[in-house]
């Protein structure tokens, strides 16, 4: 069944879905299980995040240490690239408008209106958040910075993940430790993206299950077919 009916008035369907989510959350009494429910948001906090990360760290401590050090360098490189891209893009807007790359926030029902785009977004956002926030958390644990809570939040059609470090611990930590924690999230996302891209490029099986809009990014149809 085609999902193109969502393309028109997508924001209405998103709002309806949000109301349904709130009703289900209330019926399941999720407030008793770490959730905070408001008309515009659904937030989950867990105080046991660090204990789970500590168990992971016992098996991967050496690798995480290397990753944490790489994150410091990668963080500065990505920050430099972001400034370069921003300045170049602003310059293009005035000097070469055809080269200007429009940027927008991805919001289901607002900037994402097709059914396929919303579906891909909803499938990918949990992975991105888990990788990103998990990296922050495990490096903070490595640096012996206490994590008070970890969790996620949904603001109608916008999503967020978080690990909440103890502010005193974070402020008292060495500068290099703070840089490792800060750089870990974005670095983890970049590494994951490259690893996934490599997997797609080297395993033809994925061509069978990859969505059509993404297929052309990784594969070319052979001539004569």
Regions found by a protein language model. Name each.
Residues 1-225:
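Hydrophobic transmembrane alpha-helices and their immediate loop junctions
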């Amino acid at each position: 069944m085609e999902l193109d009916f969502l393309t028109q008035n997508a924001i209405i369907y998103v709002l309806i879905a949000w109301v349904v989510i709130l009703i289900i959350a209330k019926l399941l009494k999720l407030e008793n299980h770490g959730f905070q429910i408001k008309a515009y948001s659904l937030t989950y906090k867990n105080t046991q995040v660090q204990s789970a990360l500590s168990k992971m760290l016992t098996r991967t401590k050496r690798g995480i240490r290397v990753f944490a050090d790489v994150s410091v360098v990668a963080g500065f490189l990505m920050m430099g690239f972001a400034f370069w891209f921003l300045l170049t893009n602003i310059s293009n807007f005035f000097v070469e408008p055809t080269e200007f790359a429009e940027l927008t926030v991805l919001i289901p029902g607002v900037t994402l209106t097709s059914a396929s785009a919303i579906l891909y977004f909803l499938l990918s956002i949990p992975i991105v958040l888990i990788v990103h926030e998990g990296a922050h958390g495990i490096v903070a644990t490595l640096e012996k910075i206490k994590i008070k809570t970890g969790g996620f939040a949904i603001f109608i059609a916008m999503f967020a993940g978080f690990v909440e470090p103890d502010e005193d611990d974070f402020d008292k930590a060495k500068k290099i430790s703070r840089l490792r924690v800060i750089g870990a999230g974005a670095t983890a996302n970049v590494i994951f993206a490259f690893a996934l891209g490599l997997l797609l490029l080297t395993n033809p099986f994925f061509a069978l299950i990859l969505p059509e809009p993404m297929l052309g990014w990784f594969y070319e149809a052979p001539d004569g077919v």
